[in-house]
Curated annotation (Swiss-Prot):
InterPro entries, alphabetized: aa-tRNA-synth_II, aa-tRNA-synth_II/BPL/LPL, Phe-tRNA-synth_IIc_asu, Phe-tRNA_ligase_II_N, Phe_tRNA_ligase_alpha1_bac, Phenylalanyl-tRNA_Synthase, tRNA-bd_arm
Residues involved in Mg(2+) binding: 254
Similarity comment: Belongs to the class-II aminoacyl-tRNA synthetase family. Phe-tRNA synthetase alpha subunit type 1 subfamily.
Gene3D superfamilies (alphabetical): Bira Bifunctional Protein, Domain 2 (3.30.930.10)
EC number, as in UniProt: 6.1.1.20
GO cellular component term, pick one: cytoplasm
Keywords recorded for this protein, A-Z: Aminoacyl-tRNA synthetase, ATP-binding, Cytoplasm, Ligase, Magnesium, Metal-binding, Nucleotide-binding, Protein biosynthesis
PROSITE patterns, A to Z: AA_TRNA_LIGASE_II (PS50862)
Natural source organism: Dictyoglomus thermophilum (strain ATCC 35947 / DSM 3960 / H-6-12)
Record's cofactor remark: Binds 2 magnesium ions per tetramer.
Protein's recorded name: Phenylalanine--tRNA ligase alpha subunit
Gene Ontology MF terms in the entry: ATP binding; magnesium ion binding; phenylalanine-tRNA ligase activity; tRNA binding
Pfam family, one: Phe_tRNA-synt_N
């Protein structure tokens, strides 16, 4: 029996030293040092040995166990080092390779267009002002001469928070706030977000941007309004693009008009972006209604003014040749990185 155990001990040492992987080493440990290993068998059989043999085999088993565990730990350390070296060799960075450039953030195309528009009007003497996105029914509708029974005031067209508050449907309330606080002459533009219950399609979004413009002074005429907006259109789109003014109706202006420009996507031929009409509405405008002046305490007999409101989202579509407004809001980096 002593020869058998001695051979097992030598065999265990040999297999530990020759192990080529951590898995192989772990298997050797299980066979020789585990619960069913030969050292455990020796310790279990000591009780059956003659009295004079027990001390000898007990001491020998503990010495062998200590030696094998030391060998195992050394071999494990060696194999872990070799495994790590092999892994590092495979993952070694070649410093001669070109580095990867970080993707830089960019200003959103709609914000770029808003900045361009605002810059044009600032150069014409307009001041930039802002107002709250959460508005009262008074500023959003009543002060703008919109009748109480007008469809736009219904909940199916607007996002009401409660009976008196809603997400503004236009940036026009800003002009009311400005006229309440400041005296003419006034020239302001008010960019910002607006909200309406529109189903998303190629030209509509429930959240969109608008820039409101207002000028108030003595002797302002519709001809001045047309001149300012024509200069703006030519600065933004180029003098080769045709501009059209078509009579329209808005409760807060009289007379009123809509300004159209030749579609930049199809060059006037007709496409999805312009509803196959060849032109695209850019803004609504008109002379400030006398009733609006009365509401804010400005004498309509002394002062006149014009107002306009435009959608930078649609203008961005024209500038960049985009035929679907939804692309601006999908956060697709492949699309946004083009601007």
């Amino acid at each position: 029996m002593s020869e058998e155990y001695t051979e097992k001990f030598k065999e265990a040492k040999d297999k530990i030293l020759k192990a080529q992987s951590l898995n192989e080493l772990e298997e050797v440990k299980r066979i020789y040092l585990g619960k069913q290993g030969f050292l455990t068998q020796i310790l279990r059989s000591i009780g059956k040995m003659p009295q004079e043999e027990r001390a000898k085999w007990g001491r020998l088993a503990n010495e062998w166990k200590e030696e094998l565990e030391t060998l195992y730990e050394n071999k494990e350390r060696e194999l872990k080092y070799l495994t790590l070296q092999k892994k590092l060799e495979g993952e070694k960075i070649d410093i001669t390779l070109p580095g990867r450039r970080k993707i830089l953030g960019r200003i959103h195309p709609i914000n770029q267009v808003i900045e361009e528009i605002v810059t044009v009007f600032k150069e014409m003497g307009f001041q930039v002002v802002y107002g709250p996105e959460l508005e009262t029914d008074y500023y959003n509708f009543t002060a703008l001469n919109i009748p109480s029974d007008h469809p736009v005031r219904e909940s199916h067209d607007s996002f009401y928070i409660d009976k008196e508050h809603l997400l503004r449907t236009q940036t026009s309330p800003v002009q009311i706030r400005v006229m309440e606080k400041k005296k003419p002459p006034l020239r302001v533009v008010a960019p910002g977000k607006c909200y309406r219950r529109d189903m998303p399609d190629a030209t509509h979004s429930p959240m969109f941007h608008q820039i409101e413009g207002l000028a108030v002074d003595t002797d302002i005429t519709f001809a001045e309004l047309k001149g300012v907006l024509t200069i703006f259109a030519h600065r933004l789109f180029g003098k080769e693009r045709k501009v059209y003014f078509i009579p329209s109706y808005f409760p807060f202006t009289e007379p009123s008009a809509e300004m159209y420009v030749e579609c930049g996507v199809c060059k006037g031929v007709g496409c999805k972006a312009c509803g196959y009409s060849g032109v695209l509405e850019i803004l609504g405008c008109g002379m400030v209604h006398p009733e609006v002046f009365r509401i804010v305490g400005i004498d309509p007999e002394k002062y006149t003014g014009f107002a306009f409101g435009m959608g930078p989202d649609r203008i961005a579509m024209q500038i960049y040749g985009i035929d679907d407004i939804r692309l601006f809001y999908e956060n697709d980096i492949r699309f946004l990185k083009q601007f």
